[in-house]
Amino acid sequence: NLYQFKNMIHCTVPSRPWWHFADYGCYCGRGGKGTPVDDLDRCCQVHDNCYEKAGKMGCWPYFTLYKYKCSQGKLTCSGGNSKCGAAVCNCDLVAANCFAGARYIDANYNINFKKRCQ
């Protein structure tokens, strides 16, 4: 769920507050549209697509609880998750790891969505 995703982000990117990822580019935060502005925004586009796929499996990604572990910046999804829990955990884990490897460009935070995301 979104609370767990926030905690996963904190695990892989402890140096930056999670809310910096909630209004970034064209895909991080609100619904996505247009061309991603950079690699970090592409992480969010992939995450959106992953949640969409989980939704088509009958899951509710924003609310699905799952079990995971964070140890020294490394995430693992627990083996005992339900089908939906495993799917959503994997979506969030992949995104949090992607965030850790992508450059954060301050100019792409809180952009003019209507102008830049067509």
From Swiss-Prot:
Its main location: secreted. Keywords: Blood coagulation cascade inhibiting toxin, Calcium, Cytolysis, Disulfide bond, Hemolysis, Hemostasis impairing toxin, Hydrolase, Lipid degradation, Lipid metabolism, Metal-binding, Myotoxin, Neurotoxin, Secreted, Toxin. Gene3D superfamilies: Phospholipase A2 domain (1.20.90.10). Expressed by the venom gland. It is an enzyme of class 3 (hydrolase). Ca(2+) binds at Y27, G29, G31, D48. Pfam families: Phospholip_A2_1. The keyword DNA-binding does not apply. One of its GO terms (molecular function) is calcium-dependent phospholipase A2 activity. It is found in: Secreted. Binds 1 Ca(2+) ion. InterPro entries: PLipase_A2, PLipase_A2_Asp_AS, PLipase_A2_dom, PLipase_A2_dom_sf, PLipase_A2_His_AS. Its cofactor is Ca(2+). A motif (Coagulation factor Xa binding motif) lies at residues 52-69. Snake venom phospholipase A2 (PLA2) that shows several activities. It shows strong anticoagulant activity, probably by binding to coagulation factor Xa (F10) and inhibiting the formation of the prothrombinase complex, shows direct hemolytic action, causes neuromuscular blockade with a gradual contracture and a decreased sensitivity to ACh and KCl, abolishes twitches evoked by indirect stimulation earlier than those by direct stimulation (in the mouse phrenic nerve-diaphragm preparation), and causes myonecrosis when injected intramuscularly. This is Basic phospholipase A2 CM-III. It comes from Naja mossambica (Mozambique spitting cobra).
